[in-house]
Amino acid sequence: MVDNSEIRVVVGMSGGVDSSVSALLLKQQGFDVVGVFMKNWDDTDDSGVCTATEDYEDVKKVADEIGIPYYSINFEKDYWERVFEYFLNEYKKGRTPNPDVMCNKEIKFKSFLDFAMDLDADYIAMGHYAATKVDENGIVHMMRPKDGNKDQTYFLSQLSQDQLKKVIFPLANLTKPQVREIAIDAGLATAKKKDSTGICFIGERNFKKFLSEFLPAQSGKMVTPDGKVVGEHAGLMYYTIGQRSGLGLGSTKESTDPWFVVGKDLKKNELIVEQGYDSKLLYATSLDASGVSFFTGQPEHDIDLKCTAKFRYRQPDVGVTMHYHAKDNTVHVEFDEPARAVTPGQAIVFYNGEECLGGATIDRAYQNEKQLQLV
C-alpha cells in the first residue's frame, strides 16, 4: 500500500475557499502538502488596495491552521508575456478571447507546475472543480466533477496529457456547499470568503476603462446588416457577438425589440447590429476552430466524431459532429441545431458523456456554408 506521506503535493492557494479546502483534504489524507501563492498580476485596484496582499494573508492564515509550509511565487512576467499579450492581440483582431483558458495552460499548469517540480512535487493541486480517471493503459482522462454547476473542465480544455498526469483534483466529488461546510467545520479563515468573479487582472474595475488603458479605441458607425447607420460605437473591441446591453439604441417605428451585436467589419470599423433576439445573423450551423488540444493526446489521423460541445462557460451541451484535421490541427464543427452567438476567440470544448475530450479556439462561424461576418 502506498504511503501518502511520501507523496508531495504542492497546492496552488489563491486565498479562496476552494483551494483552502483542497489543501486541507490532502493534508487529512496524509499527503506531504506544501502551499504556494501565485502572484500573476499587479492588481492594485482603483482605490490603491492590492488585493493580492490580502489574499496572501489569507493563504498564510489557512496554511498555519492546516499546519503546512507555504511560499509565494511571482509569475507576473510569464503572465504578461503568455496570457495578457495574447489577450490584447485577440482584441486587436476584433475577437473575444478567454484568458482563463490560457492562464491555466500557460501559468497554473506550466509555470506553476515547473516551480512545484523544483520543490520536489509528485503532483500539484488547486481549487478546480474537475475530475480525472485513469484507464488500463495508464492514460488519464478528464471527467466532469460532481458539481455540474461549478464544472471548470471548460477552462482546463487546453491541458496536455503530461500536465494532466501531474494533477490531483481534491474537489472532484464535492459540491460547492459541501466545500463551504468543510471549511466552516474546520474553522478556516477563508470559510465565508466570497468567490472572486470576472477576469483576474480586471477584478471589479470597469472593463471598458481597463481595456482603453492598453489599446487605443477607435470609434465608428453602428450599422444594420443592410448598411443603415443607427448610431456610433466606442470601439469594436468593447463589443462581443450577441451583446445587448450598452448599445444605447432605442426602439424604432418598425419594432420595439432590443438591439443585438450581430457582426463586426474590421476594414470599415463598423459594428453591425440588428433588432430581435432571434436575428438570423446570430445563428451558426457550423464553425472552424484551431489550436486543438485533446487530453489523451493528439490523433495522427483525421477523425469524424459525433459528440457534444460547449462554446461558452456554463452553457448546456449542444450536439455536434466534429471533423478533426490532423495535418493542421484544426476542427470543423457542425451543429445538430443552429447555435446562437458563436464568438471567434472563445473556446469550444468537446464532451463524450461525462468525459471532457479537449478543446480549440473558435476562428470562424458559418450559416449554411456562408461565413458569418462575426469579425
UniProtKB/Swiss-Prot annotation:
It is found in: Cytoplasm. Its main location: cytoplasm. GO terms for biological process: tRNA wobble position uridine thiolation. The active site is at residues 103, 200. It comes from the Bacteria. It catalyses: S-sulfanyl-L-cysteinyl-[protein] + uridine(34) in tRNA + AH2 + ATP = 2-thiouridine(34) in tRNA + L-cysteinyl-[protein] + A + AMP + diphosphate + H(+). The keyword Nucleotide-binding applies. One of its GO terms (molecular function) is tRNA binding. It is an enzyme of class 2 (transferase). ATP binds at residues 12-19, 38, 127. Keywords: ATP-binding, Cytoplasm, Disulfide bond, Nucleotide-binding, RNA-binding, Transferase, tRNA processing, tRNA-binding. Its EC number is 2.8.1.13. One of its GO terms (cellular component) is cytoplasm. PANTHER family: MITOCHONDRIAL TRNA-SPECIFIC 2-THIOURIDYLASE 1, TRNA 5-METHYLAMINOMETHYL-2-THIOURIDYLATE -METHYLTRANSFERASE. Belongs to the MnmA/TRMU family. This is tRNA-specific 2-thiouridylase MnmA. It comes from Lactobacillus gasseri (strain ATCC 33323 / DSM 20243 / BCRC 14619 / CIP 102991 / JCM 1131 / KCTC 3163 / NCIMB 11718 / NCTC 13722 / AM63). The lineage of its organism: Bacteria, Bacillati, Bacillota, Bacilli, Lactobacillales.
